[in-house]
Amino acid sequence: MKIVAVQIDLGRQKEKIEFIKSFVDNAEKWGYNTIILYLECSIRTKVTPFFDEDDTYSMTEIKEIADYIEGKGLLAIPAFENFYHIEKLLQYKEAASLSEFKDERIEGRGWSPERFKRGSVGCTSNPDFNKFFDAYITEVCSVFHGKYVHMGLDEVFEFAECPRCKARLKAGETKKDIFFSQVMHDYELAKSMGKTMLMWDDFFEYYDILAELPRDII
């Protein structure tokens, strides 16, 4: 099947389910056969019960959305971020240890507003980081029956600045190695769920890892 996809952003702001369904109806009418749901960290799961209900969806709600899309014969693809673009997660004290920064405005490049002072990048050198995201992504994906999952991995401009990551650099790894390692971790996670991994390609311009990646990443 040739994928003709449109994406709706549910990660940066919460939309009403009625609006999402109308968006899906219009997408189908306009000839799209695939809906990419950009979720980031916007679903309340077993590992994220602390998420603000006013700003996130329950598993029941995301299942209703996925079921509606798939019930129309369309493909629903969940899209995540588990490296950068996770500032909404890191604002919670329960997830503070997953960040590279305690205060990005002091320790990083100073891009972050007060609300997101821990920044947008997680520490992939912290073993709890991928443990958390593996559980989160796996639970959310359980309500999607298509073969694809989008792992994001874009715009990782500010990483490997914390003590854990700097220790890896001092030991001989490069930032390219750290990025490649996270891509491959996500690839194995997708495989474990029986899904094909999608990702954004912008950071191949900075870290030339394309030739080293499995050919079935899209």
Question: Where would I find each of the regions flagged by the language model?
Answer:
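N-terminal amphipathic alpha-helix/helix-capping segment at the start of soluble metabolic enzymes
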Residues: 1-2
